[in-house]
Amino acid sequence: EEHKLKVAEAFLDDVGKGYARMDADDMIKMRVAPGDVVLITGRRSTVARAVQAPPSHCGQYLIMMDGNTRNNAQAGVDELVSVKKVPFKAANSVLLSPVQANQGVPTDEEIPHIRQLLQGLPVTIGDNLQITFLGARPRSYTVDGTNPRGAVLISSDTAIAFRAPEISAERAFRVSYEDIGGLDRE
């Protein structure tokens, strides 16, 4: 059963975990148990794991999500989203590509670390993920494919593959004044 809930910011401890915190009463109405996967639809649909909100956040028809989940749902704080329980499967494999064209593909040595960071995360094709490597800035990747299709949960057994970003001709040849040194007095 689909419900409309108002988007709120996630707790700091929930950032990057793919959680959607909701009032226990709202979860009961949707027949959602903690740990279930829910489909969240703003201007786009994404998936997250249902987690119970503390009593202080109850009775307000809120869904607490981190910035990445809000971006994937294309919904801002205080906007209404549709939420419903969806079936999910363990991901056999996930194909990711870097969001930035100049960002390389991780090495084979980095993939086990990435799998560990993404373990337990629900994803669907088209989602963007933030992966923070040790001591480095977060890197953004797009989910280009999943096996099976639909809502999947990344596990320790999920094969994670990367493909290089495709650079469009338009993007490859866009040059700015800064690229050529700007305009100085000659």
Predicted regions and their residues:
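Beta-strand/loop-dominated core regions that host nucleotide or nucleotide-derived cofactor-binding catalytic loops
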Residues: 1-176
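N-terminal pre-P-loop "Q-motif" helix
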Residues: 178-186
